[in-house]
A protein has these predicted regions:
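Conserved, well-structured ligand/cofactor-binding cores
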Residues: 1-142
Length: 142
């Protein structure tokens, strides 16, 4: 079992996760950081002050305020707008490494993502439930 904290993932450990299917876990301090950031973002979303990408549109719609009732739809639409990819699927070990790297970055507590989402990513990685990621055109965002 490899315990991730966002700061100590080495190439050797990453290869154990990607190639050897070593299971991972998130340390408690990192979980607290994620929860704190998530609550901060949730609090911002519920206030009237506009904050880009949380309760406003994106890009040229940055000045458009999104109603509180539509915030969940805004986030769903953002995910759908990034769902693209062409070419051959990447090898599973590459995607496993990508998942581990993403989890490791998210547990630093800077994104505002919910802990439940990260724990689900960990569960999927540990169960070897791996998404198809295509070699060209995949997008990523914080």
């Amino acid at each position: 079992m490899i315990i991730l904290n966002g700061n100590q993932l080495t190439l050797d450990l990453l290869m154990k996760i990607a190639r050897d299917h070593e299971k991972i876990e998130i340390d408690l301090e990192s979980q607290k950081l994620v929860e704190k950031a998530s609550l901060f973002v949730k609090d911002i979303a519920m206030h009237d002050e506009p904050v880009y990408g949380i309760n406003t549109g994106f890009g040229h719609l940055a000045n458009v305020r999104i109603d509180k009732k539509q915030l969940s739809l805004l986030q769903s639409n953002l995910l759908m707008s990034h769902a693209c990819g062409v070419g051959d699927p990447l090898p599973i070990e590459t995607v496993r490494a990508m998942m581990a790297l993403r989890i490791n970055a998210l547990i630093k507590g800077y994104s505002g993502i919910r802990l439940e989402t990260i724990l689900k990513m960990v569960e999927y990685l540990n169960l070897n439930i791996i998404p198809v990621v295509y070699e060209k055109g995949s997008l990523g965002a914080s």
